[in-house]
């Protein structure tokens, strides 16, 4: 049984570290995107979080594919930040990692915590158009 727990721990540790996690949030770029009325996706993460890595994979897949349900993903600005950066987290009232926010211009149109299901994330992005 102990080996099983070690194996599970190693699996989640690998999953959490398999994605490059870095803060890409920039207040000036965010403000510019808002003033231009763009769709803005913001995700929060923390270093050891496996579900954060899964959510980032879904968002990166959508971006890499270039199209998301008949829209170009490059029409959407994407930012991420480490939830331990309390200045950014507090500015969006984010308390937990794996929080996903979608803005249409200055209006927040979607918020979820822990969502990693590709179909639901894609649906939220499509609904924000």
Residue ranges and their predicted role:
Residues 102-129:
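Non-catalytic, surface beta->alpha helical segment in thiol-disulfide oxidoreductase systems
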Residues 1-4:
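Positively charged n-region of N-terminal signal peptides that target proteins for export
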Residues 44, 70-86:
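Thiol-based oxidoreductase modules, predominantly thioredoxin-like and allied folds used
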Residues 53-68:
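Typically the conserved alpha-helix immediately C-terminal to a functionally engaged Cys/Sec
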Residues 17-37, 126-129:
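N-terminal leader/targeting and pre-domain segments
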Residues 9-17:
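Hydrophobic h-region of N-terminal signal peptides that target proteins for export
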Residues 92-101:
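Structural micro-motif
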Residues 35-47:
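Short active-site neighborhood of thiol/selenol oxidoreductases, capturing the structured segment around
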């Amino acid at each position: 049984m102990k080996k099983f727990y070690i194996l599970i721990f190693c699996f989640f540790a690998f999953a959490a570290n398999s994605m490059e996690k870095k803060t890409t949030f920039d207040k000036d770029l965010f403000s510019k995107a808002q003033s231009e009325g763009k769709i803005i996706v913001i995700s929060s993460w923390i270093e050891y979080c496996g579900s954060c890595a899964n959510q980032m994979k879904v968002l990166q897949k959508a971006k890499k594919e270039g199209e998301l349900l008949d829209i170009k993903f490059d029409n959407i600005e994407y930012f991420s930040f480490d939830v331990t950066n309390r200045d950014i987290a507090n500015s969006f009232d984010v308390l937990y990692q794996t929080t996903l926010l979608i803005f249409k211009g200055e209006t927040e149109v979607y918020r979820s915590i822990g969502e990693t299901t590709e179909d639901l994330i894609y649906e939220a992005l499509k609904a924000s158009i």
